[in-house]
């Protein structure tokens, strides 16, 4: 198969004639029951039900197959499973490879619900979790136990945005245990700014809700796996009843068509805002992977092909409750909301003690309020003016 640049892949992948049936876009095929014309057809579908043959709605329709094909071509995987949200993609990927008595290595700066899953669900299953500092590097080898089955990465880290030395971590882990299953929450890079499977990672997970969809109106999760792990991931996720509706799959594929131009704009605008913030007296540190002030910046330059729109910055002081309200409640363009990856700019505030509470296993010397922003497609100078007005409200 001819290898294309990503901008071409975004447009053309997942549009085989079987999926499009003569139209530009893949068909939107909503179905639970799929009809067999004969006993032989039923036997064939049953035999190949895990290989893209129409069998039953839970296995997928042409709409799902088109998105899975697109994702595999984007990320270089052997297969892609679709989930109703990113959290489902994370939890089912882990559950596919662990059992009672096993051990998981988890980034201590991972997405809070991922840590909650380990602390509540895995603990109930008597599966132990050890949290590691994402900047651990080769010392990850010292944490691997005989029963360690999964090493989970996140790049960059949630909120504090550290970039781990992924090649060093992966090499060290595989030196101790070549069969360990390594997976990564790769949402920030949209699965393409960091090519996980090319770095000997087994499974690349995304909350497709973010950049793949790109419009803050669909929830979906994806897990793209290599050949070694695909069959087990697929069958376990199927047995757990994981699936996504055809409309969400269709809308996600449509969103990916513009992913290239969207990521370029997110990068350009976010770096401009980040550089402006780094010059403001109210700001102590900017945690944008593309800036030298971000821990792991050198690994970002080496391993990533670009930046997206999410980053954070620490203020020089811890805001009082009144200052937080004054700062956060009156933005004209920034919206206060969870999630990110859409066309709109978002903002959230965390206090140092809140970060310490959700990161009990790693220590960061945060003293000022931590502001997380996602830079959307508004005029970047107007976004900067909106932030400047916010600083004036806390002066």
Task: Describe the role of every protein-language-model region.
Residues 1-50:
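N-terminal glycine-rich, Lys/His-bearing helix-loop that initiates the first secondary-structure elements
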Residues 119-120, 128-130, 146-149, 262, ...:
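PLP-dependent enzyme catalytic core of the Aspartate aminotransferase-like
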Residues 38-88, 114-120:
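Conserved N-terminal alpha-helix of the aminotransferase class I/II PLP-enzyme fold
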